[in-house]
């Protein structure tokens, strides 16, 4: 303490100049200042060593001290100066601006805290430039600082109690999420005003109603389980549910994300341990819409899945209709063929119908196909019927092929009309008439010629040893390739082997 006092005395006497002539009073204010301090007034009235300090009195709390590199006791001492009137200036107001020429100490005033001038209790702080002995760069300017807390105003008027009471309601009105206060049985005791923008209901329409009344039927069970677990375990709850909106005509609902916690009432400490339990007074639930973009993506994904299922069902339905059409066409062909062949027996016709259906059913099993082939090979009537049905089906396919050509080219292809160079853009292109009957005869003649050629090819070879011509295989003989039948060729090979072996043994 002694060292600090000597340091303070040395600092005040050597660093600060001994000039106190630049005190500049500021105009007084109508608002009363801090109370008088006679003891400190007498002490500082006799202090003439405080130089290069501008003291000016004004209304408001004490000035704020900014100090750098000086002793804390000196900073406290200088801070005390700003609250005390000086001698010889009785007309000065009751607060001072304190500013140092050096960079060690800088004291600047705070803003006025007057509730009468502003509803928030803060008025504008008018800046003043300190007058010093010489106008150099060390002269500081008064800075604007935030207003002090309400508890540090000292003698200032406190803020309006009515404004303090309106803050909770203002917070609830500005809140975007929906706040619900539920009873232990799930009844809505309070709903924040934001429920109108989220659900479409007013607060009075939701209050005194069960929350489950507005929840989707599929989510009621899950929500009830979450709430019961929250009340039983006294743990926070986090769940999602669909809330029905007010527009019941379209049966729309919004997906909400809810966070909440129970409010428990503890028994009095004087109660017995048997009665010392916690009762749930209510549950605070804060609900907000689930992210809109994610819900839209989820809805679109579900819509695409549903559309895919619907299209697959439609494809299966069309396939069934196509199979029914094919079956009806086959039955029509079967009826025509049975009308043409009147000599068939009823039992044979029934069996042939079953064989035809099994023959045309590509989705059947291998056993059914095998049984149909067996019946076809055994029964000549069924074989002839199947051949006729296959010919008629081939003609039908040919007709459909011809119709497709006519639709694409515009020619009467079935009547024999042909195009030469028209489709390729040749100038000499023309339409010609092709005789379908002669074409059919030429085709039949070509088929006969092909069959005769195959027969002639089969009968060209003749065994030079036995003279046969129906051998399945032909072998090379003394006269060249394919001159011996299979039997004669084997016999000739054996004889040649024995002859060569005997000649080797004799030699």
Curated annotation (Swiss-Prot):
Gene3D superfamilies: Erythroid Transcription Factor GATA-1, subunit A, PAS domain. SUPFAM superfamilies: Glucocorticoid receptor-like (DNA-binding domain), PYP-like sensor domain (PAS domain). Disruption phenotype: Reduces the conidial production under both light and dark conditions. Increases sensitivity of conidia against thermal and oxidative stresses. Decreases aflatoxin B1 production. PROSITE patterns: GATA_ZN_FINGER_1 (PS00344), GATA_ZN_FINGER_2 (PS50114), PAS (PS50112). A zinc finger (GATA-type) spans 463-488. One of its GO terms (biological process) is regulation of DNA-templated transcription. It comes from the Eukaryota. The keyword Cell inner membrane does not apply. InterPro entries: PAS, PAS-like_dom_sf, PAS_fold_3, Znf_GATA, Znf_NHR/GATA. Residues 170-234 form the PAS domain. One of its GO terms (cellular component) is nucleus. Keywords: Metal-binding, Transcription, Transcription regulation, Virulence, Zinc, Zinc-finger. GO terms for molecular function: sequence-specific DNA binding; zinc ion binding. Induction: Highly expressed in conidia. NCBIfam families: sensory_box (TIGR00229). Probable transcription factor involved in light regulation. Plays crucial roles in fungal growth and asexual development. Involved in conidiophore formation, sclerotium production, and conidial stress tolerance. Positively regulates the fungal pathogenicity towards maize and aflatoxin B1 production. This is Blue light receptor lreB.
């Amino acid at each position: 303490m002694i060292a600090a006092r000597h340091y303070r005395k040395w600092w005040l006497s050597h660093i600060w100049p001994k000039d106190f002539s630049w005190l500049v009073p500021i105009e007084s204010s109508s608002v009363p200042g801090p109370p008088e301090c006679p003891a400190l007034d007498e002490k500082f009235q006799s202090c003439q060593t405080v130089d290069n300090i501008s003291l000016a009195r004004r209304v408001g709390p004490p000035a704020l001290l900014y100090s750098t590199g000086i002793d804390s006791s000196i900073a406290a001492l200088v801070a005390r100066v700003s609250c005390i009137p000086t001698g010889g200036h009785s007309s000065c107001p009751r607060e001072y601006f304190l500013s140092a020429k050096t960079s060690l100490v800088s004291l600047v005033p705070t803003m006025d805290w007057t509730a009468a001038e502003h509803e928030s209790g803060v008025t504008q702080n008018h800046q003043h430039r300190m007058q010093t002995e010489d106008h150099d760069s060390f002269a500081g300017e008064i800075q604007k600082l935030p207003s002090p807390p309400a508890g540090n105003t000292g003698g200032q008027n406190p803020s309006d109690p009515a404004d303090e009471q309106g803050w909770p309601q203002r917070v609830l009105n500005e809140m975007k999420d929906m706040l619900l206060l539920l009873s232990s049985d799930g009844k809505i005791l309070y709903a924040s005003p934001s429920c109108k923008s989220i659900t479409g209901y007013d607060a009075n329409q939701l209050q005194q109603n069960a929350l489950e009344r507005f929840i989707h039927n599929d989510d009621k069970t899950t929500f009830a389980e979450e709430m019961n677990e929250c009340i039983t375990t006294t743990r926070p709850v986090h769940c999602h549910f669909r809330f029905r909106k007010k527009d019941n005509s379209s049966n729309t609902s919004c997906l909400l994300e809810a966070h909440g916690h129970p409010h428990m009432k503890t028994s009095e400490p004087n109660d017995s341990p048997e009665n010392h339990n916690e009762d749930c007074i209510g549950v605070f639930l804060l609900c907000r819409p689930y992210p809109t973009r994610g819900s839209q993506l989820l809805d679109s994904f579900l819509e695409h899945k549903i559309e895919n299922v619907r299209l697959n069902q439609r494809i299966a339905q069309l396939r069934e209709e196509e199979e029914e059409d094919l079956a009806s066409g086959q039955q029509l062909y079967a009826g025509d063929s049975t009308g043409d062949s009147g000599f068939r027996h009823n039992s044979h016709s029934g069996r042939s119908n079953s064989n035809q259906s099994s023959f045309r059913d590509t989705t059947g099993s291998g056993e059914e196909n095998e049984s149909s082939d067996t019946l076809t090979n055994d029964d000549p009537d069924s074989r002839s019927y199947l051949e006729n049905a296959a010919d008629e089906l081939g003609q039908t396919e040919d007709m459909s092929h011809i119709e497709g050509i006519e639709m694409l080219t515009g020619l009467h292809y079935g009547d024999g009309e042909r195009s030469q160079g028209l489709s390729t853009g040749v100038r000499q292109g023309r339409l010609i008439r092709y005789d379908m009957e002669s074409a059919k005869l030429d085709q039949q003649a070509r088929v006969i010629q092909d069959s005769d050629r195959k027969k002639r090819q089969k009968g060209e070879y003749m065994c030079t040893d036995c003279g046969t011509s129906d051998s399945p295989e032909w072998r090379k003989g003394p006269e060249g390739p394919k001159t011996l039948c299979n039997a004669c060729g084997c016999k000739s090979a054996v004889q040649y082997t024995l002859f060569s072996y005997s000649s080797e043994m004799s030699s």
